[in-house]
């Protein structure tokens, strides 16, 4: 920050830290997310099935999707699938929406849903790292002074 602009107050810092905690909680899977994601996968397989899958095939496909999507919260997966069903995933050809997305494509769609949260989180963390210019100058000068003092010994 430039001279004359105050840094964050302690109260503002606590508010930013609280918001960071909230966002981190939102973007991490929690509680019953695994059950919800399994239900969403079952819905997806039924809605987009091009052929009848055996129970074993469904089990294997579900395990692959769950492994790929392990770090995705259920709400992001739900939003990504709703966009898939509506044909509104950027960069996907119209005819691809007739089938289930690959696990990689679904992960990309989930990441798209999480992007705004992750960007806000990065911005807030950066805000906490911002120091007043006088403090930065003092820190930069301090090691230089220490090095000079060591050289004179």
Residue ranges of model-derived segments:
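Charged interaction scaffolds used for protein-protein
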Residues: 1-153
């Amino acid at each position: 920050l430039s001279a004359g602009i105050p840094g964050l107050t302690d109260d503002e810092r606590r508010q930013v830290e609280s918001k960071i905690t909230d966002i981190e909680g939102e973007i991490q899977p929690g509680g019953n997310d695994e059950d919800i994601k399994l239900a969403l996968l079952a819905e997806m397989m039924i809605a987009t099935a091009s052929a009848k899958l055996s129970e074993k095939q469904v089990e294997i496909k579900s395990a692959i999707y769950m492994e790929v999507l392990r770090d995705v919260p259920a709400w992001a997966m739900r939003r990504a699938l709703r966009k898939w069903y509506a044909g509104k995933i950027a960069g996907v050809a119209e005819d691809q929406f007739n089938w289930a997305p690959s696990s990689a494509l679904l992960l990309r769609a989930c990441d798209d849903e999480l992007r705004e949260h992750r960007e806000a989180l990065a911005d807030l963390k950066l805000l906490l790292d911002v120091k007043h210019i006088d403090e930065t100058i003092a820190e930069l000068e301090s090691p230089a002074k220490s090095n000079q003092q060591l050289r004179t010994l």
